[in-house]
Design a protein with these regions (language model features):
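Short glycine-rich, Thr/Ser-proximal phosphate-binding strand/loop in the N-terminal lobe
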Residues: 28-66, 162-195
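N-terminal, Lys/Arg-enriched amphipathic/low-complexity engagement segments
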Residues: 68-72, 76, 80
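Short, ordered loop/turn segments at secondary-structure junctions
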Residues: 95, 124-126, 163
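Single conserved hydrophobic/aromatic residue that forms the stacking wall/gate
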Residues: 204-215
């Protein structure tokens, strides 16, 4: 999904500007890019804000009101930036914090109403595929298989592939914010015996890696 912030600003030579927004469990990023007629691009500006949208959400299953308000406030500014740069389109992606929260759909409706930005909430596997496309596009051609790992706030994506195609991919619910919220005391940073035992049980998920990397 995409949202036209302003009328198409493509120049006579076919150049156009687009905004790309990535809403994660911890950070919110905006990249403004000029797309040239030959398909190449130039990065015009990049912005990153630590909105901590997923803070506490993985414990309760709901996004907190203060986290949502903080995120919407930053998104308003990003929408304004897209207008200033004459972006003809905004591509906005939301990941683990939104897709796992019971109130995620309601939050996305609020975002559209308050900012005009229409987000696409992607699955874990689609997130892994998009990460692979981004990373592999910068690799030299090779048929050798590689393991791509992206550790985010709410999930970890893994892909096995070469520079041309992926062979297997998966997404695990093992992000740094998720694990910190679930197992560590938010004030002292310590971990109780009960939570340590639960953390050890979570290691069972790593057995999924064996099937992923076995080609």
């Amino acid at each position: 999904m995409s949202h036209p912030v302003v009328p198409d600003q493509a120049g006579p030579d076919g150049e156009r500007v687009i905004g790309i927004i990535d809403l994660g469990s911890n950070s919110l990023r905006l990249m403004l890019v000029r797309i040239l007629p030959d398909g190449s691009h130039t990065v015009l500006n990049q912005v990153k804000n630590m909105v901590r949208l997923g803070e506490g959400a993985f414990e309760t299953g709901h996004l907190r009101e203060e986290s949502m308000a903080r995120t919407i406030n930053v998104l308003r500014g990003m929408a304004e930036m897209c207008g200033v740069y004459g972006a003809s389109e905004v591509i906005a992606i939301a990941t683990a914090a939104v897709r796992d929260a019971a109130n995620g759909p309601d939050f996305m409706r609020r975002v559209k109403e308050k900012t005009g930005i229409d987000f696409r909430v992607v699955s874990g596997r689609e997130e892994a595929r998009l990460i692979y496309l981004g990373v592999s596009s910068g690799l030299a051609h090779t048929e050798s298989l590689r393991l791509f790992i992206d550790i985010g706030g709410g999930s970890t994506e893994l892909v096995v592939g070469n520079s041309e195609e992926y062979r297997n991919l998966d997404s695990l619910k093992m992000g740094c914010v998720r694990l910190s919220n679930l197992f560590f005391d938010k004030d002292s940073g310590t971990i109780s015996a009960k939570r340590y035992a639960a953390l050890q049980r979570s290691e069972e998920h790593t057995s999924e890696l064996q099937s992923l990397i076995r080609i």
